[in-house]
């Protein structure tokens, strides 16, 4: 993967973590809501993990966080 892609995955994970915390959810609660393990959720949010996601899973995460999907791509820089 190139640097730009890795950086986008890092920012996506940090954005998911930001909105999860803003909603008052734990990683375990969000993971359960989107049918993945807490470890997988932790890997998604970890700034140095670079775990990729399917569009379907991103849609599930946005729905669970009650935010528009596009919000996940408005990276907090």
Model-predicted regions and their roles:
Residues 35-51:
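Recognition helix of helix-turn-helix/homeodomain-like DNA-binding domains
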Residues 1-22:
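A short, Lys/Arg-rich alpha-helix, primarily the initiator
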Residues 48-63:
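Short, basic-rich loop-to-helix N-cap that marks the start of a DNA-contacting helix
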């Amino acid at each position: 993967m190139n640097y730009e892609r890795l950086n986008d995955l890092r920012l996506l994970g940090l954005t998911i973590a930001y909105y999860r915390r803003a909603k008052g959810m734990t990683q375990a609660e969000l993971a359960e809501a989107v049918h993945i393990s807490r470890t997988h959720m932790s890997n998604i949010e970890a700034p140095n993990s670079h775990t990729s996601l399917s569009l379907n899973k991103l849609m599930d995460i946005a729905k669970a966080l009650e935010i528009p999907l596009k919000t996940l791509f408005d990276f907090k820089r």
